[in-house]
Every structure is written in structure tokens, then in C-alpha cells.
Design a protein with these regions (language model features):
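Nucleic acid-binding interface residues in structured DNA/RNA-binding domains
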Residues: 1-105
Length: 105
């Protein structure tokens, strides 16, 4: 059975380690198409299982959280990331320290 685009995205997001973040573009590339960054946003907004698909670990390429975070807004996303030990500098995730280092094949 072939996976849908959203299923591919969810499988990648499930792999983001506790205490780390990934970018929309990074998730898109790992899911099979580097141009899917906006689609990643749509998929995360439609997340069917937020307890097992940690969409709050996905941030933009500068390390900013989404004001449109579907499950409580940007403040909730920041709260969840801080609970995992992710640090923010002037409202941005320190990407050098917390970005998931997953090779893109």
C-alpha cells in the first residue's frame, strides 16, 4: 500500500527526537519532496493524533514557532518545547543547538 503525502509527513515528524526541532523544509525533504514545506504545514494543522505525532517540534527555518499552531497557538508550542528543554533566544529556537541532525537522502 502506498502512503499518502500526509502519512509520509507524519512518519517523519514522529522521528523528531525529544528536545529537538525540525523545520518545515527539512520535514518536506525527508518526506520526499523539498517543495512540500507548505504541505507540511497543512498536514500538521490536520494532525489526527497529536499525542503520537509531535507537530509542536516543527518550526520555521529561522526557529520561530507558528502563531497558527493548531493545538493552542504559538504560546502553547513554546510551552511544550520548553518542557522538553528547548531554549529560546529572543523568541527563536537556538537552531544550532536544537535542530534535528537527520541526513536527507
Amino acid at each position: 500500500m502506498q502512503q499518502s503525502t500526509f502519512e509520509k509527513i507524519y512518519e517523519v515528524v514522529k522521528q523528531i527526537p525529544y528536545g529537538q526541532v525540525a523545520t518545515y523544509g527539512q520535514i518536506a525533504a525527508l518526506a520526499g519532496n523539498k517543495r512540500w514545506a507548505r504541505v507540511v504545514g497543512y498536514a500538521l494543522h490536520a494532525n489526527p493524533d497529536p499525542d503520537n505525532i509531535p507537530c509542536y517540534r516543527v518550526v520555521n527555518k529561522e526557529g520561530r514557532v507558528s502563531d497558527a499552531f493548531a493545538f493552542g497557538g504559538g504560546n502553547k508550542q513554546i510551552e511544550l518545547l520548553k518542557e522538553e528543554g528547548v531554549e529560546f533566544i529572543n523568541g527563536y529556537v537556538d537552531m544550532k543547538k536544537y535542530q534535528w541532525e537527520r541526513p536527507i537522502y
